[in-house]
Amino acid sequence: MKLYAKLLLCSICVAFIAVRWSAPSFNEESLKGARVLVTGASTGIGEQLAYHYARLGAQIVITARRGNVLEQVVSKCREMGAQKAFYIPADMANPSDADLVVKYAIEQLGGLDYLVLNHIGPSPYQMWDGDVQHTRWLLEVNFLSYLQMAQKALPTLEKSKGSIVVVSSLLGKICGPFALPYASTKFALNGFFGGLQNELAMQKSNVSITICILGLIDTDSAMEKIKGYINMTAYPSHEAALQIIQAGATRQSESFYPWYTFYATLFRDWFPYLRDKVIQNSYTYNP
């Protein structure tokens, strides 16, 4: 075996051991009665987040655009054991809605322990067609509203020694095709909240930030988008949601799900030519 191959194998082993041994243990009881706001909670990962928090006995406020669907999710959350469960419809393309949602959650729950930012706006899965306006709109929904909600929630989270949990993507770490506007918003999230982690630490803040890097998850919207473009295993949304909750509860700075997202991020700059070839060959493109 050549030297560089041995070094690579050793690095992988060290990284794996470091991740397995450094992650703090998760105590489900710590979330009993916790005051949680989850965005994008009508379907997909956000819906699963709401159900897990409910099962763990948290107090929940959920938001998304469709009030009728949120009502059904809240009803199920109450059945599953949520101490309290409320919903508020909101459109995160409207800057005033972001403030109103945080204000509503604080009023209903008496404060916040967790702000879980998960919502995204719809975006076509295709080669970029030059539509700058759509990218600008998506930045408002997927990025700027996150900043606005974090800013609004920071004072109450400081008092409760709470956490901001940001649901991001491997596409915010590695450049892939067909989702450029979406990926741009995730790169922006990773950059901003990664920097905010350092600023809060330097200020000795009580607030932690967890950035969750997700790979392909089996939500209905994701499966519909990638059909005919990529053949890759999709991982369960309920497992992704539980991983997000555990990472936030244990105040990890960064979390990766599924396993390959960690290694893809770790080695992305080691072999750029190979990396790009793997990415390009993983997709189907028929001009």
From Swiss-Prot:
Q: What Gene Ontology molecular function terms does this protein carry?
A: oxidoreductase activity; steroid dehydrogenase activity
- Give the E.C. number(s): 1.1.1.-
Looking up CDD domains in the UniProt record yields:
11beta-HSD1_like_SDR_c
Which catalytic residues are annotated?
Y182 (proton acceptor)
Membrane-crossing residues?
Answer: none
- Alphabetically list the UniProt keywords: NADP, Oxidoreductase, Secreted, Signal
Give the source's domain of life in one word. Answer: Eukaryota
- For whether the record's keyword set contains NADP, the answer is yes
Q: Which InterPro entries match?
A: 11-beta-HSD (IPR051253), NAD(P)-bd_dom_sf (IPR036291), Sc_DH/Rdtase_CS (IPR020904), SDR_fam (IPR002347)
Q: What subcellular locations does the record give?
A: Secreted
Q: Tell me the residue numbers annotated for binding NADP(+).
A: 40-66, 91-92, 118-120, 182-186, 215-221
Catalytic activity field? cortisone + NADPH + H(+) = cortisol + NADP(+)
Binding of substrate occurs at S169
Q: Does the keyword Oxidoreductase apply?
A: yes
Q: Which GO cellular component terms, listed alphabetically, does the Swiss-Prot or TrEMBL entry include? A: extracellular region; intracellular membrane-bounded organelle
Function in brief: Unidirectional NADP(+)-dependent cortisol dehydrogenase (in vitro).
Question: Which protein are we looking at?
Answer: Hydroxysteroid 11-beta-dehydrogenase 1-like protein
Q: Which organism is it from?
A: Danio rerio
Gene for this protein? hsd11b1l
